[in-house]
Amino acid sequence: MNKKEKIRIIRLLLKQYEKDKNILNSLNQANLYPSINYEDYYQTSSSSKEDYLLHRIQLKQELTKRIIFIEKSQSIIGDEYYHIILEDYFYEHKHWWKTYCSRATYYRRQEAAINAFFDYVTSIL
């Protein structure tokens, strides 16, 4: 697999990570017990309410697993490589590295970060 394909996969994973964090945040802030409209209350069955709450719990668990998967990569690949991955493909800042290192060092570390992150992803999946 070449570098462009790896970068595309990393970008997709990080975009999904961002979506998952936003959805989980909105689920955590949502009111689980909204005000009751008694007409709706008597028309709906209790099983549909239970299904709704069960679905929310399962969705939260699934989102949490996916978020932890990406955040765990920081401890596996190291802070420096994780920082490179986030700056390049999550925040998409173009010239953030110019204050830290030379061009050759940046590209060498970027290549190593891509390979380390991709190896982590493929080892889990």
Regions found by a protein language model. Name each.
Residues 76-92:
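Short amphipathic alpha helix immediately N-terminal
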Residues 1-75, 125:
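N-terminal interaction/assembly modules
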Residues 9, 80-84, 109:
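Residue-level detector of well-ordered alpha-helical segments, enriched
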Residues 91-105:
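Helix-turn-helix DNA-binding module
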